């Protein structure tokens, strides 16, 4: 009799994806973040579901319903902070996951990479809309500022913004639709993640050396299941330390003040994981130019497979490209810091220089490093 996991139509899919999947024997801990993202997504869907049971998407009661969750619902405070800090953990894992793809040349799997970028956009949209829901000061003004950016689109901009708002300002209609989208998008993300995996399993995983590993594969279970469980335990440990000891460290104090359209907070800024893009947006004095730079700062990832000039796939044996990669990481950290600072000297010029460096590195310096390394190989 054949094994049920190899014969049953449904179990067979799981078997080929997580049990008997041939996996390169040398993939490092940087390959753990895909499974960690899956865990983050499940955690966010579950905590979000329980929060939605008590939340009311109405401008008059949204803020107090969140307070009610924290004060009156059993373990409501924990569910709320798991959800808020879970989003931060999600983005930390995401940035590392994308960085790993950049470093080891995983972007040469075109379909997997492109779906990953669509996932990134969907995730950013979901997180932004979730930030609006507690209806604090930063929720309201963040929603106003970010949606207003679309008014920079020529001819249709103003109409588009009013259409998204459902009126002439961010109000009840906006909050209701943001809640509806925030609820449905994680399930779309789940479907996209499955597609992402489907395309990945067509080619098999990349590995740190960047060379084909068909002659040296091992089954996913038990080797990588146990490795993923260790990663998951560490993720949960860090998340619980955040939730139980420093629940508000990544949030904004302004969001504990109910939304007031009549008073603007001194510094309007998004959550920390959007600050790098916000800094790029602010570094350009022109509104349309800023919006284009903001969009391109993420869309530029689509160009990366076409900007690969090196004869080697991975950066493992390319010291010059490694320098460029870590310079890019340092630049993104600088942009994140600048995004949280007020618009004044010297932060303006630092932000502008960091933005120029960001685009220069990806479009010019990294491809150039690849060409130089190719020539060095001929010596």
UniProtKB/Swiss-Prot annotation:
<keyword id="KW-0830">Ubiquinone</keyword>
<keyword id="KW-0496">Mitochondrion</keyword>
<keyword id="KW-0812">Transmembrane</keyword>
<feature type="transmembrane region" description="Helical">
    <location>
        <begin position="347"/>
        <end position="367"/>
    </location>
</feature>
<feature type="binding site" description="axial binding residue">
    <location>
        <position position="97"/>
    </location>
    <ligand>
        <name>heme b b566</name>
    </ligand>
</feature>
<comment type="function">
    <text>Component of the ubiquinol-cytochrome c reductase complex (complex III or cytochrome b-c1 complex) that is part of the mitochondrial respiratory chain. The b-c1 complex mediates electron transfer from ubiquinol to cytochrome c. Contributes to the generation of a proton gradient across the mitochondrial membrane that is then used for ATP synthesis.</text>
</comment>
<keyword id="KW-0408">Iron</keyword>
<dbReference type="InterPro" id="IPR005798">
    <property type="entry name" value="Cyt_b/b6_C"/>
</dbReference>
<keyword id="KW-0999">Mitochondrion inner membrane</keyword>
<dbReference type="GO" id="GO:0005743">
    <property type="term" value="C:mitochondrial inner membrane"/>
</dbReference>
<keyword id="KW-0479">Metal-binding</keyword>
<dbReference type="InterPro" id="IPR048259">
    <property type="entry name" value="Cytochrome_b_N_euk/bac"/>
</dbReference>
<keyword id="KW-0472">Membrane</keyword>
<dbReference type="GO" id="GO:0006122">
    <property type="term" value="P:mitochondrial electron transport, ubiquinol to cytochrome c"/>
</dbReference>
<feature type="transmembrane region" description="Helical">
    <location>
        <begin position="178"/>
        <end position="198"/>
    </location>
</feature>
<dbReference type="InterPro" id="IPR030689">
    <property type="entry name" value="Cytochrome_b"/>
</dbReference>
<keyword id="KW-0249">Electron transport</keyword>
<dbReference type="InterPro" id="IPR016174">
    <property type="entry name" value="Di-haem_cyt_TM"/>
</dbReference>
<comment type="similarity">
    <text>Belongs to the cytochrome b family.</text>
</comment>
<keyword id="KW-0679">Respiratory chain</keyword>
<feature type="binding site" description="axial binding residue">
    <location>
        <position position="196"/>
    </location>
    <ligand>
        <name>heme b b566</name>
    </ligand>
</feature>
<feature type="binding site">
    <location>
        <position position="201"/>
    </location>
    <ligand>
        <name>a ubiquinone</name>
    </ligand>
</feature>
<feature type="transmembrane region" description="Helical">
    <location>
        <begin position="77"/>
        <end position="98"/>
    </location>
</feature>
<comment type="subunit">
    <text>The cytochrome bc1 complex contains 11 subunits: 3 respiratory subunits (MT-CYB, CYC1 and UQCRFS1), 2 core proteins (UQCRC1 and UQCRC2) and 6 low-molecular weight proteins (UQCRH/QCR6, UQCRB/QCR7, UQCRQ/QCR8, UQCR10/QCR9, UQCR11/QCR10 and a cleavage product of UQCRFS1). This cytochrome bc1 complex then forms a dimer.</text>
</comment>
<feature type="transmembrane region" description="Helical">
    <location>
        <begin position="320"/>
        <end position="340"/>
    </location>
</feature>
<dbReference type="InterPro" id="IPR005797">
    <property type="entry name" value="Cyt_b/b6_N"/>
</dbReference>
<dbReference type="Pfam" id="PF00032">
    <property type="entry name" value="Cytochrom_B_C"/>
</dbReference>
<feature type="transmembrane region" description="Helical">
    <location>
        <begin position="33"/>
        <end position="53"/>
    </location>
</feature>
<feature type="transmembrane region" description="Helical">
    <location>
        <begin position="288"/>
        <end position="308"/>
    </location>
</feature>
<dbReference type="Pfam" id="PF00033">
    <property type="entry name" value="Cytochrome_B"/>
</dbReference>
<keyword id="KW-1133">Transmembrane helix</keyword>
<feature type="transmembrane region" description="Helical">
    <location>
        <begin position="113"/>
        <end position="133"/>
    </location>
</feature>
<feature type="binding site" description="axial binding residue">
    <location>
        <position position="83"/>
    </location>
    <ligand>
        <name>heme b b562</name>
    </ligand>
</feature>
<feature type="binding site" description="axial binding residue">
    <location>
        <position position="182"/>
    </location>
    <ligand>
        <name>heme b b562</name>
    </ligand>
</feature>
<dbReference type="GO" id="GO:0008121">
    <property type="term" value="F:ubiquinol-cytochrome-c reductase activity"/>
</dbReference>
<keyword id="KW-0813">Transport</keyword>
<dbReference type="InterPro" id="IPR048260">
    <property type="entry name" value="Cytochrome_b_C_euk/bac"/>
</dbReference>
<dbReference type="GO" id="GO:0045275">
    <property type="term" value="C:respiratory chain complex III"/>
</dbReference>
<dbReference type="InterPro" id="IPR027387">
    <property type="entry name" value="Cytb/b6-like_sf"/>
</dbReference>
<keyword id="KW-0349">Heme</keyword>
<protein>
    <recommendedName>
        <fullName>Cytochrome b</fullName>
    </recommendedName>
</protein>
<feature type="transmembrane region" description="Helical">
    <location>
        <begin position="226"/>
        <end position="246"/>
    </location>
</feature>
């Amino acid at each position: 009799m054949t094994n049920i996991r190899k014969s049953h139509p449904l179990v067979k899919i799981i078997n080929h994806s997580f049990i008997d999947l041939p996996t390169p024997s040398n993939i490092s801990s940087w390959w753990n973040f895909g499974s960690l993202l899956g865990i983050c997504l499940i955690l966010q869907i579950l905590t979000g579901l329980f929060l939605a049971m008590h939340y009311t998407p109405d401008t008059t009661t949204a803020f107090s319903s969140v307070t009610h969750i924290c004060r009156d619902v059993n373990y409501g405070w924990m569910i709320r902070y798991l959800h808020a800090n879970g989003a931060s953990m999600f983005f930390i894992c995401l940035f590392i996951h994308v960085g790993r793809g950049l470093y080891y040349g995983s972007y040469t799997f075109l379909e997997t990479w492109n779906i990953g970028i669509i996932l990134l956009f969907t995730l950013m949209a979901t997180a932004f809309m979730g930030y609006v829901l507690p209806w604090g000061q930063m929720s309201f003004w963040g929603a106003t500022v970010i949606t207003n950016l679309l008014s920079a689109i020529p001819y249709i901009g103003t109409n588009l913004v009013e259409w998204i708002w459902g009126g002439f300002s961010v109000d009840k209609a906006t909050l209701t639709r943001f809640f509806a989208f925030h609820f449905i998008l994680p399930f779309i993300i789940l479907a996209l993640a499955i597609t992402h995996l489907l395309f990945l399993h067509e080619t098999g995983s990349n590995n740190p050396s960047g060379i084909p590993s068909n002659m040296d594969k091992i089954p996913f279970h038990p080797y990588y299941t146990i490795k993923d469980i260790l990663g998951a335990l560490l993720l949960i440990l860090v998340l619980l330390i955040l939730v139980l000891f420093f629940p508000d460290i990544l949030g904004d104090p302004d969001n504990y003040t109910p939304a007031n359209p009549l008073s603007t907070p001194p510094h309007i800024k998004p959550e920390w994981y959007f600050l790098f893009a916000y800094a790029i947006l602010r570094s350009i004095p022109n509104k349309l130019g800023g919006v284009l730079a903001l969009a391109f700062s993420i869309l530029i990832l689509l160009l990366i497979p076409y900007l690969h000039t090196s004869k080697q796939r991975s950066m493992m044996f390319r010291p010059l490209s490694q320098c460029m990669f870590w310079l890019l990481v340092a630049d993104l950290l600088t942009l994140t810091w600048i995004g949280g600072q007020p618009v004044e000297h010297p932060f303006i010029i630092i932000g502008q220089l960091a933005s120029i460096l960001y685009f220069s590195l990806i479009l010019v310096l990294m491809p150039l490093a690849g060409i130089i390394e190719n020539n060095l190989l001929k010596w």
